[in-house]
Amino acid sequence: AVGPVADNTITDAATSPDGFSRQAVVVNGVTPGPLVAGNIGDRFQLNVIDNLTNHTMLKTTSVHWHGFFQQGTNWADGPAFINQCPISPGHSFLYDFQVPNQAGTFWYHSHLSTQYCDGLRGPFVVYDPNDPHASRYDVDNDDTVITLADWYHTAAKLGPRFPAGADATLINGKGRAPSDTSAELSVIKVTKGKRYRFRLVSLSCDPNFTFSIDGHNLTIIEVDSSNSQPLSVDSIQIFAAQRYSFVLNANQAVDNYWIRANPNFGNVGFNGGINSAILRYDGAPAVEPTTNQTTSVKPLNEVNLHPLVSTPVPGSPSSGGVDKAINMAFNFNGSNFFINGASFVPPSVPVLLQILSGAQTAQDLLPSGSVYVLPSNASIEISFPATAAAPGAPHPFHLHGHTFAVVRSAGSTVYNYSNPIFRDVVSTGTPAAGDNVTIRFLTNNPGPWFLHCHIDFHLEGGFAVVQAEDVPDVKATNPVPQAWSDLCPTYDANAPSDQ
């Protein structure tokens, strides 16, 4: 692991995680990038050095540290043209932010176009020396992080606008495509009798994965950096950008067991060891498992997740019992997604810079129709009714700068105002289920915060809005470094072929 102070050098390099070689965007030479780690209370100083040379995968970049509140450092959140101009090739930019009150499992990824699909993504863990769950596990280290990623043999800009599935699923950076079932699989080692805190991170650009380990139950203790009451399950459907910590008790016979991560579309199943990795007990032979998948009898259901420590839900316990309720009406026209009639097109001037330059109202902020101005210290409710008008469901939605209470989950018609889970990415479900996923949060963090579908191809198609929170206080609460102010003039001077 690297951090909390680290250089992250971004380059193009050939990589063959599934036996097929292609150019990718790598961090310090690898994809997924290295684990970034620190402790609660740390100041992270992450210097991103742009040495990219391949315009097909973009030469500019911008990195989002997913799940961090960035209170007072909205400029360090990362989304290109929301919070900053991209970093230009041959330049670097220091992301310098404090993590005073968050711990758990996070990740980082490019937040420029579809660049993270080409490899710029990796896990991020903030440890809590006083973790309330500490007595439940014996091991929690670099080797207990499990990343899931969809991998494509074609660069995102050269492939279809909306791919019909990945070529391979990578578990900890290794996997197999159906075309080559001899590629090496990841091996995760355990010692019989020990309890492991595994941190499952979806680095996905598109599919959700149903994750399971043959012969073992998984006890969930953390959801997107929020501690949860322990919940025992035998499979976890994890959507793009979500994270779960689960405890695995290595109490089975010494052997090899299949680890499975089945995508919801594309190359599904496990023939030839696709969508798989290996759980190997110490003392087991170095061979592939022969275990069989059993039917899941206790799959994760989001409504069964509850905060470890009682957390009040913003607003009052009734539908619309908030200071401001917003409905997000989805649409699609064959090439672009729309929310309430607007498809998000990145503005040439980042939204934060517009605010710092004096723009205050939704009418003044660009892109027109995509910026929602929220009052300070208010309870906000957002509903996302699933609709056949927005294909590619379920759409996982992510709000930057916050965790939110999921008062109505996908697959449920119940509103829970007493003990719903708080998280930062939520599945908005399917029209077939009649879903109307509803979230609540408090505006306690001034700045423009992106709210978008985390299927990166859908985001590229405009499936996003900006929540501009407490606009009058943004300038005073988010002083920007000179290096940030220099990003836009440098970027704007690039030739198109250097963007």
Swiss-Prot record:
Cofactor binding remark: Binds 4 Cu cations per monomer.
The keyword Oxidoreductase belongs to this UniProt entry's keyword annotation: yes
Transmembrane stretches, start-end: none
Disulfide bridge partners, by residue number: C85-C488, C117-C205
Uppermost EC category: oxidoreductase
Gene Ontology annotations for the cellular component aspect, listed alphabetically: extracellular region
Biological process according to GO: lignin catabolic process
MF term (GO), any: copper ion binding
Function: Lignin degradation and detoxification of lignin-derived products.
Protein name per its UniProtKB record: Laccase
